[in-house]
Amino acid sequence: MREIVSNALSVRHAAELAALVGYIDFTQPLVSSLVDRVLDIASVLTAAPSYARVEARPEGHPWHVDTGSKGHMGWCCLSASVLLTPPESFTGGGLYFRDEPETAVYHYRDLVLYDSDPGNEHCVTRSRGDRRALIMFFRGVENG
């Protein structure tokens, strides 16, 4: 499963979240509104070990699925992210899915949701400039 919810955040709200680099609580009002959008699509839980953070990571992420490279996030059944800075504020930093390796996703203000199925293996390329994203990892109801 992979879905995109377009324009999930306003320009102003994206900028507000971009200023909050680090771990962030699911009850933060802007994050909470995004979680509500996630819950419209999937049954997930926000209790630990689920977590969210605003990330500024110029080194990107190598190819992986969100259960962790060593299985350390085996509880993760759904991930979601929103690019919080406009693509013109950085270079590189594309989100790629293995099944579409030539297509970069620059999901500014769009909520991208995907499950932890191996078919959703993805990476984020190195970036220069100001690239920030909200990333959220959820455990499933069945993982209780």
Task: List PLM regions with ranges.
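Fe(II)/2-oxoglutarate oxygenase catalytic core
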Residues: 1-111, 119-144
